[in-house]
Amino acid sequence: IATQSVHREYGGVVPELASRAHQQNIVPVVDQAIKKAGISKNDLNGIAFTKGPGLMGSLLVGTSFAKSLALGLNIPLIEVNHMQGHLLAHFIDVEGYEKPKFPFLGMTISGGHTQIVKVDDYFEMKVIGETIDDAVGEAYDKSGKVLGLGYPAGPIIDKLAKLGNPKAFTFTKPKVDGLNFSFSGLKTAILYFIQKETTKKPNFIQENINDICASIQYTIINILMDKLKKAVKETR
């Protein structure tokens, strides 16, 4: 359903390409989902679509398709905040899975978002911490680009990190007040570290790639966990 191949040569998501790919794929994807569910379009009793946040071009494609389908079938149209959707996905009925009890804290982490959310009820949510610059996914992708790992770099760094020593190298964690995050400084620190070490030893990356990835991931996870622990204390 989803592919990053159209963005790989650019080292990141290109909004125009993303919206075009979305436009090409949305009809066959919906058709496939309906067939897999063993129903027809006439069995639908509502259309939920992502209103935001996200890339404007892709959001417009989804909105236009959803409105057209709902109008054609004469069924309700339901706007969804996709970050709320991530949190509420935990309430889908799954055998053997215990649903969260309100209130609880949720952390949403992706290529474009990093948030800590206090969830009091299904539609009572408050963002109590978020990134003031770059998201976690961007930190992974930019680090991967510096290391020559390609895009998307997150899965590659995660895989290599399992083979390395997370305490081999130390990167300074950004100091941000409250529950907010910042990853731009970490990206810069990693870039300067790699430039410095490869100047002294050209094969530094190749010889230490597992340890570098492990150290980067260890630092990022610690930043997230420190803020989450602080959020737990402040919301008890």
Model region roles, listed by residue range:
Residues 48-50, 81, 105-110, 117:
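Short beta-strand segments
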Residues 80-104:
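Conserved phosphate-binding catalytic cores of ATP/NTP-utilizing and phosphoryl-transfer enzymes
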